[in-house]
């Protein structure tokens, strides 16, 4: 339990697939309900830099953010086939889609980032590790709503 552990956010690893890209990098993973798990990244001096941290947002909101930045962007991830048409119709800045061979998670990118983050001291123990969920699951939302309704009915009784 005291072994060192390096946490690698999924969208960071996906962005790292486009090592040394000159454009902004926008990984998009389909989160259902017109939302994506995403972030905005760039490479500076061969280093992945987070422009906007990972988040779960409606794809329309992400398009607005990217239009406001006014920079070229490259998209990758399983959200590309889902939201490609929406991007084509609404994005006003130059954009492209990553080639198929780097469009999905790759163990090599996770390992490379693990080495970098480890050298930077971004290490925790297994006991300290807490998964970071960007959105509450549907089951958790429904359970919370049910508990809230039960409390309300108890107050009214």
Where are these regions (language model features)?
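Acyltransferase
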Residues: 96-157
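Surface "functional belts" at beta-alpha junctions
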Residues: 3-104
């Amino acid at each position: 339990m005291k072994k060192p552990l390096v946490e690698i956010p999924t969208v960071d690893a996906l962005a790292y697939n486009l090592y040394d890209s000159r454009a902004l990098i926008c990984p998009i993973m389909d989160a259902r309900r017109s939302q994506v798990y995403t972030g905005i990244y760039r490479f500076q001096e061969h280093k992945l830099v987070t422009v906007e941290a990972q988040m779960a947002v409606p794809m329309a909101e992400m398009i607005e953010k990217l239009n406001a930045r006014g920079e070229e962007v490259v998209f990758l991830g399983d959200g590309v086939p889902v939201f490609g048409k929406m991007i084509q119709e609404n994005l006003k800045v130059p954009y492209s889609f990553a080639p198929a061979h780097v469009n999905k998670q790759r163990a090599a990118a996770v390992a490379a980032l693990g080495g970098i983050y480890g050298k930077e001291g971004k290490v925790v123990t297994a006991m300290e590790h807490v998964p970071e969920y960007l959105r509450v699951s549907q089951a958790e939302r429904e359970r919370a709503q049910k508990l809230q309704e039960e409390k309300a009915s108890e107050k009214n009784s």
